[in-house]
Amino acid sequence: MDFEKYGAYILEETAALLNIDSPSGMTHKAAEHVKARFEALGYPCEITRKHGVFVNLGGEDKENGLLLEVHMDTLGGMIATIKPNGRLKITAIGGLNANNVETENCRVITREGDVYEGVAQLVNASIHVNGEYNDTKRTFDTVEVLLDEDVKSAEDVKKLGVRVGDYVCFDPRVRITKSGYIKSRFLDDKLSVGILLGYAKYLKDEGITPKRAVYAHITSYEEVGHGGCTNVPDGVTEAIVVDMGCVGEGLECDERMVSICAKDRSGPFDYDVTNGLIAAAKKMGANYAVDVYPFYSSDVAKTLTAGYDVRHGLIGAGVYASHGYERSHVDGALATLKVLAGYIE
């Protein structure tokens, strides 16, 4: 089977989704987009109450169903204070880190739908003026958002319709290189949505009906901890998360591999499911690594704590610099696709 033909499709779908702002709690536009993309492939799907997307990928045995969980929500910011000088103090949505957004362009989206450009900068950001520039710890007390508007006071900002509670969305800066790398904010976990679309297209192209019912839940609150709590159909016995694979010191995975997670901070994954994923990687010739993630949790942890009696596992394309300006590779995406194809028969 020539899986490589799905590489360009996966990256194109990923890039399109990356360019739609979708911080946790504001995923409605992304949900409409994802729903339309699955429907274009011929799959029935619906938008959930929490603005996720639920997809029925078909399959025979509905008493031994498999749920695939990925998330389309991302990190972001929200205005916490409009300062007297017209600058904005923000609060993080999810694990947004001030170090990683300093100097990044952003958009403030008001509750009425107006959009204003801005940039995140250190307070007193001119190094020729600020003698403490190098020594200042970057937090959201010291990194602020400047609107690209002629505002000098809180009143000026409010005249624009900007208010506390408005979302701040950071530029993903999507780049796809000739060598197959994809660089962007929020590859966690929009790359996995692209991979899942690639898997859905593979099933259609090959005319495959899985032996077991397969569902997908593209969640909308993973980054804040309650994405996978709901939408587990009756008859589902396994839930497998497709989320970013960790890349870093002490781990074996890199961006051109699929990572199979044996344990994260929530504990070990199901023994048989993990073994099955490893066996699928070997069978399909996928370049893989088995790793332990020390500071990681996923949708399926919330599925379990919500009380669902399912076996669980986790795989994902290797992604470097998580929660920052992330990097992965088409080979890692294709390796993940191969494992899905090999595991779900």
Say what each PLM segment does.
Residues M1-E345:
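N-terminal hydrophobic/helix-forming segments and targeting peptides
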